[in-house]
Amino acid sequence: KSETKRRLIENDNLYKRVMALYEEGRKKDKEVFRDNIRLTPEKIRTVVGYLESVNLGETDLDSKGRAFETFMGSFFRGNFGQYFTPREIVKFIVDVLPIEHDSKVLDTSCGSGGFLLYALNKVRSKATELYPNYAKDVRQHDRWFKYWHDFAEKNLYGIEISEQISRAAKMNMIIHDDGHTNVITSNGIWS
């Protein structure tokens, strides 16, 4: 009985921590975090249990993309009449484009943000080439971070006509470590 009570208290404490983090996110971006979490403390414990061993910083772009698309379900199966460019084609196009940290990138029909993410990843890879010791050297880390983060913040833009998919793109950008502030909901053809 005391074990059950201890578990309930742990679940409740975890629930409160998750809710506080969510509210913190909501203060930063009300559009992305506008829905309330409707999970019980037990279900949150289960989700956290699955995710706690996952390090998104060390997970490659394709794996994160597949996981995100699976998690988001019907958005990415064309149930809303949109067509999502296959990851291999997105990667090919971004690879052949001369995207640098000072390039401006605009995707007028950004969908889930695939082109934006691959462009960001390309610039981040270039930063890693320029600052190979960024993980150990604080000065290099600051330069490495500034190199790709400035690109994400100032040069990377997405427009998506569907408000729900625009929010999904922002979430996808957050999962991939920033750049979500320049994704807007609008008609990219007329804007």
Annotate each PLM feature.
Residues R77-G78:
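A glycine-/small-polar-enriched, mobile loop at the entrance of the PLP active site in fold-type I
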Residues K1-S74:
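Long recognition/docking surfaces used for binding and targeting
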Residues Q82-S191:
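Conserved S-adenosyl-L-methionine
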